[in-house]
Each structure stands twice: as C-alpha cells, then as structure tokens.
Amino acid sequence: MRLDAVAIVPAGGAARRLGVQAGRGKAAVTCGGRTFLELVCSTVAGEVSRVIVVAAPGGSLPEASVAVEVIRDSAAGAGPLAAIRDGLVYAVVATPPPRLAVLCSCDLPFVAPGVVRLLLERAAAPGVRWALPEVAGHPQPLLSVLAVDLLPEIEAFLASGGRSLRGLAATIARDAPRAVATVDADELRTVDPPLDSFRDVDTPEDLAVVERLAAARRRGG
C-alpha cells in the first residue's frame, strides 16, 4: 500500500444502455453477485490510503465492504474528467496531500491489484506525472495513475472547454513529452495476462461477457 496515494472512482454513470439494469446506475450493476462498486473499491483499497467515490448528485450508491469517502459531482453530467477534478480537489485538502491518484472507473469489475501496483510504480518515477496504459493502440485513462499536482492543468483544460481525458493526456504530452509514461500491453500482461482489467461494461452484451468470466473464475477456469 502506498500511503501517498489515493484512489478516485468516478461512479456517476447512468447505465442507460444496460437493458434491465438501466436506471440503477453502473455502480449498482452486479457481476458474480457483487456490485461493480464493491469489486472496484475492494481491489483498489488494498493499494492506496483512501478511496474517494465521485457519485452523481442525488443518486444512491450500493454499500461497499471497504471504507470509502463519497462526494458528489459538482457539475452533473459533465463527464468523468470533471468528476476526477472534483475528487482531486477533495483529496488535496488532506494534510499532507497525496502525491498520486489512481483513477479507476466503476465499470471495470476485473481490475487487477498487480495492474494498480505497476501503474503506481511507473507514476512514481522521476519526471513522470501520468502513467497511462495503452491497449490495442488506445490509451486507457480510466485505469491510470496521475500526479495530484496535475490539478491546475486539469482545471485549465476544463475551463478551455476540454472534456476528454485522452485530450488532456495529449495536451500534457505535447508540452512535456516525458511527463506521460505509456504502459504498453506487453508490460501490462506481466501482471494481468488476459488484460481483463481493461474490460469495461457499456452494453448488455458486455455484461453477459463479464458474467461468464466471473462464473469461470468461480469454477477455477
């Protein structure tokens, strides 16, 4: 566990495309009998000092078996980057403030502890401000680790009208190429061979896949 790190879990997704699960919110969707929120928070809690969940205003959240701190989006529907900004603003009030923040969307039920540890290690390297996985040629900012002192850059990017995490990463890399450390699939496979950590759930078909994987894991397959 890194005492200088927190986790920020955006959990405001409405799950509109998840068929029968729609309306309950992604945090409450279940996989293998456990909610997505529980699966994600119980994993990241073992690697950081605090878990901060950023939820939609007025919405309810399922309980988690680990200690979490719940805050509400300051701008409902503004997207995950705004939620992450809110989480960072909340986190830096602590004394001393954290150095690193694990970003992990609540719809990644198979996030592996080894992936979190690898990203924390890479983000702690000199000169690095964001450890950003890349899978199949696509950056994966919703499971990444960034330096908390990126908050001013995030605020400026949002103020300019930016909302994309990938756009933010590109902006930071343009100004300081070595600040964004890409963690490629080969390196990620050393701690998560099937790369299931990056299997997100947006559709009923996605949910059916993760349910099958969860069942296979319970059987030891």
What is each residue range found by the language model?
Residues 207-221:
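Hydrophobic helical membrane-anchoring modules
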Residues 201-202:
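Long, charged alpha-helical interface segments
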Residues 2-162, 167-197, 212-215:
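Nucleotide and nucleotide-moiety/phosphate-recognizing core
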